[in-house]
C-alpha cells in the first residue's frame, strides 16, 4: 500500500553554502563476507570515516517493515504526533534540531535504544501506532546492536587492540547509551532554486552510527579536501559513520565524518540512524595500546556524560572536540 505523506509546515530559507560543490567520488563498499573485510573497514575509517556495507545479515523484510511503519507514523495528523513532542530529548520533533537554534527541513522520532527506559513522549509514540511498530523497532535495535559490536570487534582484531573487547564492550553492555533516530524529510511542493538544508552539517558524537535510508538522495559527506560528496542511496545496504568518540579512542587515526542532508527533490526521504554510544560513566581517552607515549595523546580524558553535555550546549556544526584537545605547552619560542 502506498501512502502519500503530508508535507509538514517548515521554514524554507535554509540554504546550503554555495561554495560547497558536490562532486562524485567512490565511497568504500565493504562486503562483510569477505575474508579481508576488517582490513577494508580500518582503511575506510582512516581515509573517509565512512563506508557502505553489503551482506550485513539484517533481514530485508525487517527493513521494509520498519520503514513502512515509520511512514505510517509520519502520515498521522499533526495533532496526534504532537502528543509525543516536543522531544525531551526523546520523542517526536519537527524542524528544530537541538536547543540552540539549529533548524532543518524534517520531522523525526528519537528513541532510547533501551526501550525499558521509556519517557512519557516515547510512550505516546507507540500509543498511537500498531503493536507491530514497536515490535519492529525492538528487533531493529537488537540487529543494530549486533552489527555495531561486530564492526568494533573487527577494528579491534585488525588494530590488535588490547585488552580484547575494549571497544565492542562499550556498545554491548546494557548500560550502553545508544539511541535510534528516524527522520522524515518531506517532499517539496515546488522545486527550490538552490539546495536547501534538510539536516545541517555535523559529526556524530558517539562511537559509530549505522544509517539506512530509502532510495531518495540527499545525504552528503565532507571529504579531506573540504569538498562535499553526494552519497548514492541504497535501501538494501547500510552506511557506517565514525563518530567523535571513536576518533578520540584511536587518537585521531580514525576521523569522525562531517555529513549533512540536503533537500532538492520532490520525493520524501526516510532515514533510520542507530547511534552506538558508550555508558554515561565510561572514561574516554586515546587507547594506550595505540599511543604508547602519553605525550603523544591528542586528547584529554573525559567521560561520555561530560562530552554529551558539552555537545548539547553547542550549535550543530561546531567543532566539539576542540574543548578536549591537548594544547602544546606554552613556550617563549612560540611567541
UniProtKB/Swiss-Prot annotation:
Pfam families reported in the protein's UniProt record: 2OG-FeII_Oxy (PF03171), DIOX_N (PF14226)
Active site: 269
Organism lineage string: Eukaryota, Viridiplantae, Streptophyta, Embryophyta, Tracheophyta
Record key words, sorted: Dioxygenase, Iron, Metal-binding, Oxidoreductase
Entry's Gene Ontology BP terms: gibberellin biosynthetic process
Gene name per UniProt: GA2OX3
Purpose of the protein: Catalyzes the 2-beta-hydroxylation of several biologically active gibberellins, leading to the homeostatic regulation of their endogenous level. Catabolism of gibberellins (GAs) plays a central role in plant development. Converts GA9/GA20 to GA51/GA29 and GA4/GA1 to GA34/GA8.
Name of the protein in its database record: Gibberellin 2-beta-dioxygenase 3
EC annotation from Swiss-Prot or TrEMBL: 1.14.11.13
Occurrences of domain Fe2OG dioxygenase (ranges): 175-278
Species of origin: Arabidopsis thaliana (Mouse-ear cress)
